[in-house]
Amino acid sequence: MIPFFIVSHNNAFLVKATVNSIRRFAPYNVITVLDNKSTDADSLCILNELKSLDNVIVRLYNDNTGPWRVIREQEFCNVRTKPFILTDPDLDLTKLPLNTLEILTKIQHKHNANKVGLALDISQVDDIIKGTYNHDVTVIQWESQFWTNKIVDHEYELYSAEIDTTFCLHNYSYPSRSIRVGGDFAVKHLPWHMSFIDSLTANLVARTFYNPTISTTSKLIWKYKKIFKAKDFIVVSDNQNDAFWGIYNGWETETFQVFDRFATMSQGILDIGSWIGPTVLYNASRYKHVWAVDADKGAIKSLTDNIEVNNFQNKVTVIPKAVYHRSGSVSFGNNLFLANSRENDSTSQIYENIEGGKMTECLSFDDLIKENKIDNLALIKVDIEGGEEFIMEQLLKYSMRTKTPIYLSFHFTWWKTKDLTKYVPYFLEFVCGDVSEQIKLHPFISILMQPKY
């Protein structure tokens, strides 16, 4: 019986679907999964499950040679002396006729061709992702070339076209000739289809199609889903902040130097004013845990999406509340001092005794710590657009008591009282000393405040 070989790399959910489809019309044929050094935990788990199936072999390799292992490697020289089928796992094989193997073998013998495989269906034009795919052309434009050179055959729809890994029957006893079979044997290449990509979570998309610099398909999908690479994590665009992520890798470098200075996998970090997550996502892989606090609903949505896409759910706790001098509710909205301020643009702020905004649940700093059982902190980062005025006393007392450093962004111009004198005694308990004049001279300044030991 003709053996099957499926190429695998961090996409085992597709491999599993392909195995199940093949077993529908070839239940007794041996299926070998050739895994090219998968690192994704879910994929490795699925591959382990597949090992328990009858007639399914899973080979785990320590290198990634792409799809060419069966065709080129010495270990498969005996395999190449007989017919075999090689395929990628990202095809929809669910509708193939039950006599597929018989028909492909018949066509191969009839037309004296060493490679006969399935054509890729591009008839659902509206469902295929738009944009540049390969050599500056779209998927439709690229794939159309394989549907032009029709072979005369009164039984089947055949085309002379190169083919290797799209469910291709290889038999090197025949002369070098490649044929794609259309009609009932044309199948979808799933990653090209919006309906398929949209059915996946952003996290699964990013994990499966993770290399847009090499893979034309991954590049196409990342553009469609608006996925960006930022430092050492992945971002899914919320459409509003694309420009920010475009400059992110050079944004506030001194802030990240502070994060790196205190980074430790034995302690956490409290991020008050987390916005869409530029600091949270960075620190999720550098600290034991991140508590992310923000009251902007739009920002929280973007943040939680990006926590999911990076699989940081167990590393980050999101607290969608404002932090204030008391617990309860407070008016919160667009920045009063910036005419172009809007939701989810990093400048939202608390309205102190001013009409406007939306009533938002808030916690005092002390209650924030207590209710969320926050402890063992290496650093506290605060950037809340003037709202630091309302939590300064509780924040500084906590820092002094626990000896926790604070990286505090002052927005003194936006303070209500413009009075720093009452904080001077606290400032003197920190290594930086009295920073009052520094804050007045530079109304928008971030200062590292380390308690004296």
Where are these regions (language model features)?
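Conserved catalytic core of nucleotide-sugar-dependent glycosyltransferases
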Residues: 65-77, 93-182
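S-adenosyl-L-methionine
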Residues: 220-363, 370-374, 413-414, ...
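Active-site-proximal specificity loops/subdomain of glycosyltransferases
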Residues: 42-84
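Short, acidic, metal-binding catalytic loop of nucleotide-sugar glycosyltransferases
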Residues: 20-29, 310
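A conserved acidic beta->alpha catalytic loop
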Residues: 34-46, 325
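Short internal loop-to-helix segment that lines adenine-nucleotide cofactor pockets
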Residues: 248-270, 329-331, 345-400, 415-419
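Short beta-strand-to-loop acidic/aromatic patch adjacent to the donor-nucleotide binding site
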Residues: 80-94, 379-381
